[in-house]
Amino acid sequence: MAADAVAKGFTEYYYNAFDTNRAGLAPLYRDVSMLTYEDKQFVGAQNIVAHLAGLPFQRIKHVVTKCDAQPSHPTNGSILITVMGQLQFDDSPAPMPFVQTFHLYPEGANNYFVYNDIFRLVLH
């Protein structure tokens, strides 16, 4: 499957799960997975999902405005994805821009897990 198609399917699934049930993201991560969320770093699926599920808002909505993807290794099938978009949470008055980068690592036929995940709000 082409990197763009994987990226499209992955990001649709990821942000839908994030917006509706953050604990439901657990199957996407493994013990070797790493997350940098703003300036905080987390390693391992349990720590990553605990952080995401514990973020201090009740409702959130991500809108992806751009998603770019490339193969990131010539033979192992891993994929690098960069997402730009806006998010709005709880009763925030205006959407906030964000950028997020995922490194997906293959696990079996047409299956991937998140090896690296870097999230940053774009604040000036």
What positions do the PLM features span?
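Short beta-strand edge/turn micro-motifs at domain boundaries
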Residues: T75, T82, Q88-H124
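Generic structural signal for secondary-structure transition and capping sites
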Residues: A23, F57-I60, A109
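Hydrophobic pocket/interface hotspot
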Residues: Y14, G24-A26, I48, L104
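Short, low-complexity N-terminal intrinsically disordered segments enriched in polar/charged residues
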Residues: M1-N16
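Eukaryotic beta-rich interaction modules
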Residues: G9, I81-M84
